[in-house]
């Protein structure tokens, strides 16, 4: 998505696995890395409560900055709304820093496209 100009990636989840703390721990490991590696804002949320099939969803919501830092989060097991000010200047600061913006240095010539797999 970054290759196509994405600055914000929205990641809605409907994952019943784990409790709010386990979900948050997993997200901190994976989503902060995705934001950092791609120099984008990540906005993620998970369904909360039980659905008609009896699956219980632990909730969770967070916004991560392009440097991988958590800007705002809510790990409480209840419905909520988060507000975050996503500033273009924050995105530019990371993307203009030679030691923090790795995307331009990738080497797609060293690997083939997933679409080329048979």
Listing of model-derived features with the role each one plays in the protein:
Residues 78-96:
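A short, polar/charged loop-to-alpha-helix boundary motif
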Residues 1-81:
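CN hydrolase (nitrilase-like) catalytic-core segments centered on the catalytic cysteine
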């Amino acid at each position: 998505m970054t290759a196509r100009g994405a600055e914000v990636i929205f990641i809605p989840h409907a994952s019943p696995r784990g409790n709010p703390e386990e979900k948050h721990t997993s997200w901190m490991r994976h989503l902060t890395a995705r934001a950092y590696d791609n120099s984008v804002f990540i906005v993620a949320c998970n369904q909360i409560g039980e659905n008609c099939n009896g699956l219980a969803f632990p909730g969770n919501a967070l916004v991560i900055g392009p440097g991988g830092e958590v800007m705002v989060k809510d790990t409480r097991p209840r419905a909520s709304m988060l507000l975050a000010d996503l500033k273009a200047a924050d995105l530019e600061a990371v993307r203009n820093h030679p030691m923090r913006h790795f995307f331009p240095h990738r080497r797609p010539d060293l690997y083939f496209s997933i679409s080329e797999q048979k």
